[in-house]
């Protein structure tokens, strides 16, 4: 009896093949979000300080924080940044838009170092490497550690 039920619920072979192909096509997109090793395996490249200045500065970027709140930032060539987030003072996702102000620079290792103020909370400098995969940017605390978490930054149209 259970075999009869399984036969009625079975997915046709062509549907399975199409589903498998779809998963393979979207695998690099999904992989690029997990960690630095998978991002580099998918073909991402570390961007240089000059590439950061040319391709990122004066463009609005959006992406998640470590806590999952959405962040929108614009780096100015003067070394300041401005934006907004939907996070509370503790960095947790919230419903209220909070202004973000800060400063940025590039250290001797080519990392982009950022200090931000969320409302009245100051976040100390954090230096990260920036990578590019297709049209998106990713930030990571490490340059080569394959297990390092990456956060996506998408250029806002």
What are these regions (language model features)?
Residues 2-10, 30-103, 109-157:
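Lipid interaction determinants
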Residues 13:
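Segments that shape or occlude catalytic/ligand-binding pockets
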Residues 16-28:
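Bacterial N-terminal signal peptides
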């Amino acid at each position: 009896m259970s075999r009869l039920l399984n036969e009625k619920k079975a997915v046709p072979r062509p549907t399975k093949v199409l589903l498998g192909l779809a998963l393979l096509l979207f695998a690099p997109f999904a992989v690029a979000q997990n960690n630095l090793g998978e991002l580099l395996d998918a073909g991402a490249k570390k961007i240089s300080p000059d590439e950061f200045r040319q391709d990122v500065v004066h463009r609005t970027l959006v992406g998640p924080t470590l806590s999952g709140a959405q962040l929108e930032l614009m780096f100015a060539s003067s070394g300041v940044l401005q934006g907004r987030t939907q996070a509370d003072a503790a960095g947790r996702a919230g419903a209220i838009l909070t202004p973000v102000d800060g400063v940025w620079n590039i250290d001797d290792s080519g990392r982009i170092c950022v200090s931000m103020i969320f409302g009245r909370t100051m976040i100390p400098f954090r230096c990260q490497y920036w990578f590019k995969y297709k049209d998106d940017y990713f930030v990571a605390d490490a340059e080569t550690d394959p297990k390092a978490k990456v956060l996506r930054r998408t250029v806002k149209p």
